[in-house]
């Protein structure tokens, strides 16, 4: 048809009909989407209980992460049955729960509304938090380390939560901006190689680690490992200042804080860096640069397996395994939502576990730090949290929550034997924390 032979009015009418048809099509699509949304709202939901009824607490976090990865937002019901997850009842999600052995319940919409009403009651210490986007996770760990060398990588692997390994080179090169959440392997950020010199200086693994660290420092343009670790520490601090989430355990806590406080002073003896430490090192510490601690004394002796007076390992060692527990604080879910998220658990009393840094003496914790778990009888904190700039950080004392006295060379913990570990749950609370759409803290 030659469009030039069609009267202009007909063309106009034809265009109007086409536009009308397109509008009707779009309208019908919106109506259909609305109907589907209505049906989804009216449909049943999938509840992943996190109380004693849950068979696989640790893998349940993996299900939550998997759901977010696949674009399905879920709700974290804080303090409801141990911090349960409420998800859309999607066949693929229930199938994944079954495959991983995670306990779930199908609840009708009316029942879900009752749960919401219970949580909304101002007299009830519960809250709903929407989880929206799976955080990008980085683990700062030396190349060649196995997952069982570190509790966090071990539980991430068990829970089937993906992560990327990075180390000094990547941090120095500015790659932290790619991630939302960073865990520090049980590292020594002071440049003293973990203070293992006294006992292991002749061990092949120790000598290899020293050599690898020195080679990396040289390749990155640093004359000493301590200088490289100092810059790594500063870059991590900038990551938190810019909105990142930092989680670290064991010696990655106090050694990191000390490295920040010693930013402008040499605290390493000659066996570590080839020159003596500053004799005025203690007086030159700048505690304000650290995240959590102040007024402690550093221990420079290479033969002493300790960084400072912060650590409460000796006190916990005297207490003994049978009596070593720490208690989680009970926070207001509607007012102090951040520590509430980080302390979700199915028990409030958790068995202790040793590490190079086991716990933190209360005397050295800054006043603006939130203590979330403590052993009151010893005056020590196990689990602490704080804010810096736009970001957040969490320190957790001890090495392995299911191995009371983990020693160098010990076999890995089999988490299949500890699927409900309360101590490991605290790690995974931190993993999901960046995914939460948080309300502004009111206290």
Where are the predicted features?
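Extracellular ligand-binding/catalytic regions of CAZymes and related secreted enzymes
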Residues: 44-86, 364-443
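Helical hinge/lid and interdomain linker segments adjacent to catalytic or ligand-binding clefts
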Residues: 45-46, 51-55, 85-86, 90-95, ...
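Catalytic beta-strand/loop cores that center a nucleophilic Ser/Cys/Thr
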Residues: 150, 157, 254, 273, ...
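Bacterial N-terminal signal peptides
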Residues: 27-37
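Catalytic cores of eukaryotic secretory-pathway lumenal/extracellular enzymes that build
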Residues: 261, 270-272, 281-282
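Hydrophobic targeting/anchoring helices
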Residues: 43-150, 159, 398
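Intrinsic-disorder-associated, low-complexity terminal segments enriched in Asp/Asn/His/Tyr and depleted
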Residues: 2-5
